[in-house]
């Protein structure tokens, strides 16, 4: 069965209604955020959440020198062997965002780097493709000037410096975590790492594709998991619920903006809902909620047809993913934030920006305590742009991806999915809903909104690990 067509119709959340001030370059018309549509009452002034998912960067890789944040330009490496092994400091190298390196960031490399919480063995990770040692390559941080839009959002709005990804693994499971908070397929096993597919990961994968699992006793079972489609999971995936199930039950509108999947590609991530059989197999469900290309989010903001909940998965060239040699990710994020800020959606919206996994790069803060699902993983950055966050707020609260899921559930008074959302601290403490909605401040960027609206899709997978 081929991938279903992407979204044509658009549904709305309720809206609030004051125009934001300020003139962004390529400012969009203020969409009619009060247009009638399906709506479910919210617990906060927020009636729209946009979750932007960038790729493969630790917190320290992007914010090593951000004032007031828990970052560093010095790491630790383990040298020597046996009794001669010793921990020594190593200066992190400042690099370009468009660097060509793509490092190993699967579960085994996470365990090596973690080294029982000492965070000193990133230099012992080996490339997954060649088996050669990566050496000092993980010990880097990006030149702040090249991620200035991220720093501006953090300065004008809010940054979290202790958000840990759900598992110490790669993008396949990380994107599942961002729609449901975990990858448990039964009471003792969770998915981890990548499927063995030679095409897009999910229900479109070729027959015989396997996933990998980790047990609650932390036994890693490589290539012993089910086909990456929920109808092949234990109990036909009946317990593998996502936020989409909660939204549909409560009549909350949602869309997942992502590159269109292709049937002819190497094993790769395109869309987290390709794994979710009830969404993938239902033509009307897919066409209503899955929207391609990602720039459709800009169009929906302009047209006043933004749903209550949006996930935004970028084109590979706009994702910050190492190896694609592109510097466009920060501008892509800024273009969406600026579009919201120039529209009537601003006073009712929270834009949350996260990086899905650690990408194999150094980070100094050990996740603790470890759980029974191969996590928590290493720190990744989280930005929040909203009229209800104080300027230049840095949250040092320990969060996980379940914290974002929990905040989404709280916003629309939804029940818990029963994954990591249950034990995680909600990100609601980053907001001050008693303050008057702040006027929007434009985020300057190298590439304007018009660039992305005219950008030719790369046709590349968002991630292959």
Residue positions per predicted region:
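Bacterial N-terminal signal peptides that target proteins for export
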Residues: 1-10
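C-terminal motif of bacterial Sec signal peptides marking the signal peptidase cleavage site
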Residues: 17-20
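Residue-level signal for mature regions of secreted extracellular proteins and peptides
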Residues: 14-15, 222
């Amino acid at each position: 069965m081929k991938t279903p067509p992407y979204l044509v119709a658009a549904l709305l959340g309720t809206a609030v209604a004051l125009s934001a001030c300020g003139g962004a370059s390529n400012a969009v018309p203020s969409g009619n955020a009060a247009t009638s549509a399906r709506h479910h009452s919210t617990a906060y002034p927020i009636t729209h959440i946009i979750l932007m998912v960038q790729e493969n960067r630790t917190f320290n890789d992007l914010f090593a020198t951000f004032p007031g944040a828990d970052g560093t330009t010095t790491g630790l490496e383990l040298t020597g062997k046996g009794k001669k092994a010793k921990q020594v400091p190593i200066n992190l190298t400042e690099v370009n965002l468009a660097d060509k390196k793509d490092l190993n960031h699967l579960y085994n490399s996470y365990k090596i780097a973690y080294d029982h919480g000492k965070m000193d063995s990133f230099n012992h990770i080996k490339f997954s493709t060649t088996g050669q040692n990566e050496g000092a390559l993980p010990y880097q941080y990006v030149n702040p000037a090249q991620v200035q839009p991220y720093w501006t959002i953090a300065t004008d709005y809010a940054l979290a410096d202790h958000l840990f990804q759900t598992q110490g693994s790669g993008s396949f499971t990380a994107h599942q975590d961002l729609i449901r908070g975990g990858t448990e397929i039964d009471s003792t096993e969770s998915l981890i790492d990548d499927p063995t597919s030679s095409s897009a990961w999910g229900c479109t994968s070729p027959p015989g594709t396997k996933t990998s699992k980790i047990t609650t006793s932390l036994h890693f079972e490589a290539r012993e998991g089910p086909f990456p489609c929920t109808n092949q999971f234990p109990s036909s995936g009946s317990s593998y619920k996502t936020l989409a199930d909660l939204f549909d039950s409560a009549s909350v509108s949602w869309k997942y903006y992502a590159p269109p999947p292709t049937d002819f590609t190497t094993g790769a991530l395109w869309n987290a809902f390709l794994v979710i059989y009830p969404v993938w197999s239902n033509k009307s469900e897919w066409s209503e909620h899955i929207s391609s290309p990602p720039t459709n989010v800009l169009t929906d903001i302009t047209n006043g047809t933004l749903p209550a909940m949006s996930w935004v998965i970028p084109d590979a060239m706009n994702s910050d993913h190492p190896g694609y040699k592109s510097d466009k990710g920060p501008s892509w994020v800024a273009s969406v934030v600026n579009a919201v800020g120039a529209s009537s959606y601003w006073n009712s919206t929270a834009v949350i920006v996260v990086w899905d996994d650690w990408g194999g790069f150094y980070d100094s803060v050990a996740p603790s305590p470890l759980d029974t699902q191969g996590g928590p993983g290493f720190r990744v950055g989280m930005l929040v742009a909203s009229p209800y966050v104080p300027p230049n707020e840095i949250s040092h609260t320990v969060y996980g991806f379940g914290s974002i899921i929990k905040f989404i559930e709280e916003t629309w008074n939804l029940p818990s999915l029963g994954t990591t959302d249950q034990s995680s601290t909600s990100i609601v403490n980053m907001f001050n809903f008693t303050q008057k909605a702040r006027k929007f401040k434009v985020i300057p960027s190298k590439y304007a909104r018009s660039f992305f609206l005219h950008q030719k899709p790369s046709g590349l997978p968002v991630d292959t690990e």
